[in-house]
Amino acid sequence: MATMKDVARLAGVSTSTVSHVINKDRFVSEAITAKVEAAIKELNYAPSALARSLKLNQTHTIGMLITASTNPFYSELVRGVERSCFERGYSLVLCNTEGDEQRMNRNLETLMQKRVDGLLLLCTETHQPSREIMQRYPTVPTVMMDWAPFDGDSDLIQDNSLLGGDLATQYLIDKGHTRIACITGPLDKTPARLRLEGYRAAMKRAGLNIPDGYEVTGDFEFNGGFDAMRQLLSHPLRPQAVFTGNDAMAVGVYQALYQAELQVPQDIAVIGYDDIELASFMTPPLTTIHQPKDELGELAIDVLIHRITQPTLQQQRLQLTPILMERGSA
């Protein structure tokens, strides 16, 4: 593999001149530039990104660590993050933990060793990154998305899940439903707990009772919604409406109702959360709470880059406002 010294020798110039031509950081005459470029082409020379990053102490790379999920929300969020990285001249290294704490910490260590300029974390309270690893790299800026695992200087960006759960439930109440069930996500996740609290707050405000068995814990996945809805259908007092903690579980709810030969919303109204792309293509289109995923991804990258360039800034906690998307399921 050719080196910068090989290019300099062939072009008859110094290595610093080759560096200036490659980096375009100082004037070099057209004649010498042409010689260097010809040598680069002849030797098939590729500049070392590693050497450049060591020299500048910057890799223009951002690491992202997420828990495993087939939930389309995560793929849409990652897409927004990746697009925002590209638009700002950064590369994204994505690591999926698949719920394995050992794998998560190994991935975290790898990202840190690769000298990422910053880190995005989207995990859960029960699967936290190693405090010891994080403390070993105190200068790496970090943005937490949806939750903050431990005290520190990390910035936090989250959806107002409490308000979103309230909005969804109040919409069902305003539609005249009184027997409203809730399928929550895993209660080790702060958004799941807050959406449940929002549901309870709206029910209490309306003076509506929540029968035993009307709150079922799912897993934010398709199967979780399916199993939870089947459980609700076996309840002696079948609910008139269901608030599902995310759209992926709402897909499972639809399937359970289809197999039970029940129609949405004629027999049971359904409202979701996240507003994934699939929501508007379901039959009927899913009424849901919109999370601004592109805005969330863009904001996360902007906050992280701001932290990279100004590391002494005070910690930021930003909250995005959910919006009701009224369609045909409730």
UniProtKB/Swiss-Prot annotation:
Keywords: DNA-binding, Repressor, Transcription, Transcription regulation
Family annotation (PROSITE patterns): HTH_LACI_1, HTH_LACI_2
Listed GO MF terms: cis-regulatory region sequence-specific DNA binding; DNA-binding transcription activator activity; DNA-binding transcription factor activity; monosaccharide binding; transcription cis-regulatory region binding
Pfam families: LacI, Peripla_BP_3
UniProt keyword Endoplasmic reticulum present: no
DNA-binding region: 4-23
Statement: the UniProt record of this protein carries the keyword Repressor: yes
Highest taxon above the source species: Bacteria
InterPro entries: HTH_LacI, LacI/GalR-like_sensor, Lambda_DNA-bd_dom_sf, Peripla_BP_I
Chain ranges of the HTH lacI-type domain: 2-56
Example of a GO biological process term: regulation of DNA-templated transcription
Function description: Transcriptional repressor for the ribose rbsDACBK operon. RbsR binds to a region of perfect dyad symmetry spanning the rbs operon transcriptional start site. The affinity for the rbs operator is reduced by addition of ribose, consistent with ribose being the inducer of the operon.
NCBIfam families: PRK10423.1
Matches recorded under PANTHER family: LACI-RELATED TRANSCRIPTIONAL REPRESSOR (PTHR30146), RIBOSE OPERON REPRESSOR (PTHR30146:SF145)
Protein name: Ribose operon repressor
Gene name in the database record: rbsR
